[in-house]
Curated annotation (Swiss-Prot):
Tissue expression profile of the protein: Ubiquitously expressed in all tissues examined, except thymus.
Catalytic residue list: 146
InterPro entries the record matches: Kinase-like_dom_sf, Kinase_OSR1/WNK_CCT, Prot_kinase_dom, Protein_kinase_ATP_BS, STE20/SPS1-PAK
Species for this entry: Mus musculus (Mouse)
Phosphoserine, modified sites: 324-325, 339, 347, 359, 427
Activity regulation information from UniProt: Activated following phosphorylation at Thr-185 by WNK kinases (WNK1, WNK2, WNK3 or WNK4).
GO biological process terms, semicolon-separated: cell volume homeostasis; cellular hyperosmotic response; cellular hypotonic response; cellular response to chemokine; chemokine (C-C motif) ligand 21 signaling pathway; chemokine (C-X-C motif) ligand 12 signaling pathway; intracellular signal transduction; negative regulation of potassium ion transmembrane transport
Disordered: annotated segments: 313-356, 392-429
Keywords, alphabetical: Acetylation, ATP-binding, Cytoplasm, Kinase, Magnesium, Metal-binding, Nucleotide-binding, Phosphoprotein, Serine/threonine-protein kinase, Transferase
Acidic residues composition-biased segments: 334-348
Name of this chain's protein: Serine/threonine-protein kinase OSR1
Cofactor(s) listed in the protein's UniProt record: Mg(2+)
Catalysed reactions listed for this entry: L-seryl-[protein] + ATP = O-phospho-L-seryl-[protein] + ADP + H(+); L-threonyl-[protein] + ATP = O-phospho-L-threonyl-[protein] + ADP + H(+)
Disulfide bonds: none
Amino acid sequence: MSEDSSALPWSINRDDYELQEVIGSGATAVVQAAYCAPKKERVAIKRINLEKCQTSMDELLKEIQAMSQCHHPNIVSYYTSFVVKDELWLVMKLLSGGSVLDIIKHIVAKGEHKSGVLDEPTIATILREVLEGLEYLHKNGQIHRDVKAGNILLGEDGSVQIADFGVSAFLATGGDITRNKVRKTFVGTPCWMAPEVMEQVRGYDFKADIWSFGITAIELATGAAPYHKYPPMKVLMLTLQNDPPSLETGVQDKEMLKKYGKSFRKMISLCLQKDPEKRPTAAELLRHKFFQKAKNKEFLQEKILQRAPTISERSKKVRRVPGSSGRLHKTEDGGWEWSDDEFDEESEEGRAAISQLRSPRVKDSLSSSELFAAAEPMGTLLQVPEQISAHLPQPAGQMPTQPAQVSLLPPAEPAKPAQAQSSGERSQETKIPISLVLRLRNSKKELNDIRFEFTPGRDTAEGVSQELISAGLVDGRDLVIVAANLQKIVEEPQSNRSVTFKLASGVEGSDIPDDGKLIGFAQLSIS
């Protein structure tokens, strides 16, 4: 008599899983549907590249252990995990309804969003279930860290579950749960990120999820997060410097928002308060008047799932291709290729498979870097001189006549013969470097001028800022604010030749912030 498959433990053997369509991809991983033969069940497998993270295996195991102990109807069930080559595979329950983001995209594509994407009862029903899941996580000392429509999944019965909890977000932070350290890169878009997470001054708590929840509420009504049109550094700057966003932020056609009432808007504003202590808890939000409009899962099944895209419609089939990388590759037509060790390229079978199945690959820069954790920013070729010539330091209370000079200009490169230059190299020459000077006080309260160049198209604001921090010239806590203001200048150098901004590192002791004397402030200018 054969053993009941449901009683079997989940396999940690890669060969027991038949990988199928790609159902999601992002900066940190690829999610594929798969069939587990021993269990006779379809699952979702999230494949995360371990080479790209800075997390020890001990820390990973602790986080996986926490995930395995989470049992709640509004949290996606975690089954098991194991390592395949340089990837961590997380095996989870497959929810065939897809994500709420899939639903949003489907509605927008059909042009059915002119009076708002989802109506209030639908939003209330989905978000009430999300809050139930968040309340459970928060009570158990967990922070989700990535609440958004793309991580809210729907079952075919109308059930709502939060996905992407735990290891994937943990990996994205390099295992630094409280973010007391400085992250080297931002993974993905910061559109849903709370201000206190961006600032990286202190650790953050579960109230960061409440901010993301408020942004998600806007996303469900308008179809996108408020600052979705802007590049990441601009989003950081707008979030930190502007008043909190509202339902209207970034929406051109205000007519689409008319049907949303006061209780919905009030609920959003409660979540989007810059002071995390003023935000309600998940339990408090569940008692908010807006959630009286919530219905049951049968309502979602009828209202949403019957007109939602099927799993095959929203997925990309994977073509099997001989090779040795053991990785997925995105092709120019938007499909995916899986390269593994199954075929010998020298064999007749291998050559036949290559000729039939191989598609044109996207450029090297778009292959694995698109699928897995964001790589370190491209170097900016900034060189820190071994000896820094500095003038006499000035006391904090006085404006110096000549601040200390720090040169970060790149060394001159030998000229190439004209005939040896390619058209690509010639086009790079048209990118004129912008010479900048960052004036701020060092740890001894002495005023320094840090001179450097930024080449559009080659450098990134975050990459340059990170180099300034690595060189010990800028406090690590000021990464975000320096990068955001650098981005502001290089985007519009004609109108933003000089900006003065408050530093996240603040002032020490009895010092009083002063933007004129640059105490607790910095000035970035085009020189």
